[in-house]
């Protein structure tokens, strides 16, 4: 049997980080088994479904490198097929028309509330003849659910999960306006698409029990089910925006790499020994749904940062630069940076990446660490840099300016010798000389090596930046 999985998002918002992990697990299992992953858009909620959300989902999948087989399938466009199956169930005696009025249903709910039990439809139209139907009332179609015993879900992650049938009631599969319910449409679509394995969040467990009833009523094979644990925040509570519940696109703009996000997400609920970092080829080779944990995974942003930092360090410099250029239009101040990145500064930025990426956990940090390249003159000094350029620092800087200006060659070796000779003559430690210089060149106390910065900026720009600070202080 060829494995067919499916990712079935609703186009009502962005590709949530939890949905991205579900897509990843489906994709990995399909690749691991040599099967396919299909994309179904569950767009039956016409009021909330938008083209913008659909585009965000597809773009998010593409950015993460999660390809799907064939064209996306619209659930809404299959509504006629859903209606046909529902009506066939009525003909087969597996479902029935229900004419209960809104008032009757409200009374059932009120009685259940008064008796302290969950609201359940009482089945009053289950065995009544259609000739008793009131005039002018459009019926719904309800499934004839088993009234005794239990429905058992054989789940590859959760094990056997049992649901008393008395708690499931005769739920609606077709509304009075002829539109299918989610519960019914999913079953028909999974069957028609040939889905063999359903991998989704464990918040769908009760849905799975009801869908099992529909599968059985239709005499269709039930796909293998694997309900994966949800992702919780670091505090163990439901994932919130504060603790990482953002869309994939938000993580892209925050400067995370798709390979890093894949690597992090695959470890949320699944593992392979002590392996933290793994290639996509290793993930595909190792991944199996039987190894998914039952307990909820906790989202740890610091761990994601650490993994992303690893991928940044391992990445090709040009690819990192291209990724930076890709997100610049979407970050605060990014358009200004683009305007300042002329050909020379682009070359300087690219040349600085080997050093900068060693200290950057995200692309945003990489941009920030490179800001000394494209910042406006005179540089605004941060608080620590201002302290370094006090009167004593200014005196050191003034002497350094003269020493550097006299350099016949502007290379790291010559500059190193110049600074060390100057420090020795002034009876200063090398750090006492390098720190004020770094502050004047970058506006900060941390940066790539001071010689790297001097060479990167070039003689004229470096000397001009030193002059800026001397003039600024003198004023």
From Swiss-Prot:
It is found in: Cytoplasm. ATP binds at residue 241. GO terms for biological process: glutamyl-tRNA aminoacylation. GO terms for molecular function: ATP binding; glutamate-tRNA ligase activity; tRNA binding; zinc ion binding. Gene3D superfamilies: 1.10.10.350, HUPs (3.40.50.620). Keywords: Aminoacyl-tRNA synthetase, ATP-binding, Cytoplasm, Ligase, Nucleotide-binding, Protein biosynthesis. A motif ('HIGH' region) lies at residues 9-19. Signal peptide: none annotated. A motif ('KMSKS' region) lies at residues 238-242. It is an enzyme of class 6 (ligase). InterPro entries: aa-tRNA-synth_I_cd-bd, aa-tRNA-synth_I_codon-bd_sub2, aa_tRNA-synth_I_cd-bd_sf, Glu-tRNA-ligase_bac/mito, Glu/Gln-tRNA-synth, Glu/Gln-tRNA-synth_Ib_cat-dom, GluQ/Sye, GluRS_core. One of its GO terms (cellular component) is cytosol. The keyword Transmembrane does not apply. Its EC number is 6.1.1.17. It catalyses: tRNA(Glu) + L-glutamate + ATP = L-glutamyl-tRNA(Glu) + AMP + diphosphate. Catalyzes the attachment of glutamate to tRNA(Glu) in a two-step reaction: glutamate is first activated by ATP to form Glu-AMP and then transferred to the acceptor end of tRNA(Glu). Monomer. Belongs to the class-I aminoacyl-tRNA synthetase family. Glutamate--tRNA ligase type 1 subfamily. This is Glutamate--tRNA ligase 2. The gene is gltX2.
């Amino acid at each position: 049997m060829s494995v067919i999985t499916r990712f079935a998002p609703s186009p009502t918002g962005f590709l949530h980080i939890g949905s991205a992990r579900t897509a990843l697990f489906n994709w990995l299992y399909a690749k691991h088994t040599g099967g396919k992953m299909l994309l179904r858009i569950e767009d039956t909620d016409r009021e909330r479904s938008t083209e913008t959300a659909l585009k965000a989902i597809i773009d998010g999948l593409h950015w993460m490198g999660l390809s799907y087989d064939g064209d996306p399938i619209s659930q809404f466009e299959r509504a006629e097929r859903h209606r046909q199956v529902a009506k066939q169930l009525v003909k087969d005696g597996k479902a029935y028309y229900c004419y209960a009025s809104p008032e009757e249903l409200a009374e059932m709910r009120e009685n259940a509330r008064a008796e302290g039990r969950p609201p359940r439809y009482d089945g009053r139209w289950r065995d009544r003849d259609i000739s008793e139907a009131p005039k002018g009332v459009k019926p719904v179609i309800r499934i004839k659910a088993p009234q005794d015993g239990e429905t058992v879900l054989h789940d590859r992650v959760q094990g056997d999960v049992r649901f008393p049938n008395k708690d499931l009631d005769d739920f609606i599969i077709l509304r009075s306006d002829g539109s299918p319910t989610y519960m019914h449409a999913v079953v028909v679509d999974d069957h028609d698409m040939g889905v063999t394995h359903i991998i989704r969040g464990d918040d769908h467990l009760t849905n799975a029990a009801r869908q099992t009833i529909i599968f059985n009523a239709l005499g269709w094979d039930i796909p293998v089910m694997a309900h994966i644990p949800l992702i919780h925040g670091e505090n163990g509570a439901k994932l919130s925006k504060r603790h990482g519940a953002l869309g994939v696109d938000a993580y892209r703009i925050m400067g995370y790499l798709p390979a890093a996000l894949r690597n992090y997400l695959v470890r949320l609920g699944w593992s392979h020994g002590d392996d933290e970092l793994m290639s996509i080829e290793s993930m595909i080779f190792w991944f199996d749904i039987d190894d998914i944990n039952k307990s909820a995974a906790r989202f740890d942003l610091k761990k994601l940062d650490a993994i992303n930092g690893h991928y940044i360090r391992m990445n090709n410099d040009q690819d990192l630069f291209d990724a930076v250029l890709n997100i610049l239009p979407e970050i605060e101040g990014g358009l200004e940076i683009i305007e300042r990145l002329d050909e020379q500064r682009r070359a300087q930025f690219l040349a600085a990446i080997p050093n900068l990426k060693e200290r950057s956990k995200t692309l945003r940090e990489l941009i920030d660490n490179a800001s000394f390249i494209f910042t406006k003159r005179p540089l605004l000094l941060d608080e620590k840099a201002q302290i370094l350029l006090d009167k004593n620092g200014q005196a050191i800087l003034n002497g350094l300016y003269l020493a550097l200006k006299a350099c016949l060659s502007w290379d790291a070796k010559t500059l190193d010798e110049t600074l060390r000779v100057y420090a020795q003559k002034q009876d200063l430690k090398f750090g006492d000389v390098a720190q004020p210089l770094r502050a004047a060149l970058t506006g900060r106390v941390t940066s790539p090596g001071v010689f790297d910065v001097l060479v990167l900026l070039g003689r004229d720009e470096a000397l001009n930046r030193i002059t800026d600070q001397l003039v600024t202080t003198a004023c």
